[in-house]
From Swiss-Prot:
Necessary for efficient RNA polymerase transcription elongation past template-encoded arresting sites. The arresting sites in DNA have the property of trapping a certain fraction of elongating RNA polymerases that pass through, resulting in locked ternary complexes. Cleavage of the nascent transcript by cleavage factors such as GreA or GreB allows the resumption of elongation from the new 3'terminus. GreA releases sequences of 2 to 3 nucleotides. This is Transcription elongation factor GreA. HAMAP family: GreA_GreB. Keywords: Coiled coil, DNA-binding, Transcription, Transcription regulation. It comes from the Bacteria. Belongs to the GreA/GreB family. One of its GO terms (molecular function) is DNA binding.
Amino acid sequence: MTETQVTWLTQESHDRLKNELDQLIANRPVIAAEINERREEGDLKENGGYHAAREEQGQQEARIRQLQELLNSAKVGEAPTQSGVALPGSVVKVYYDGDESDTETFLIATREEGARDAKLEVYSPNSPLGGALLEAKVGDTREYNLPNGSTMKVTLLSAEPYHS
């Protein structure tokens, strides 16, 4: 049995994703009609339009399932308003293993939450690094597990609310 992970979203992101889901569901009959129209053109083996419409339908259905799962497991909250504490919705700056020159700035959120800001890396609060930093205060050092089984220390330099 798999455990459903809770995904944190702002109300704005939840509404945006719900709107996308509603549009995709409303578009189902359009794609079904396109498939039927292409099917009537004849030989399906060599019907590029038919295959393209079926592929589009598959991609759309996959996105619908992804959005339904995300929204069903979402915890809707407000973006953090305080600075200095790493919370979902915070842009954090950290350094690794005591090397203050090795810094990284990223958003603690879901990819969906940070999807509109291509310049900013996004780490999930459920990831090893994101989870280790949750509720850390500026100056706190935390340790997290790397994929190879070793651990790394990370120190929080700053945490600011994310504004999309």
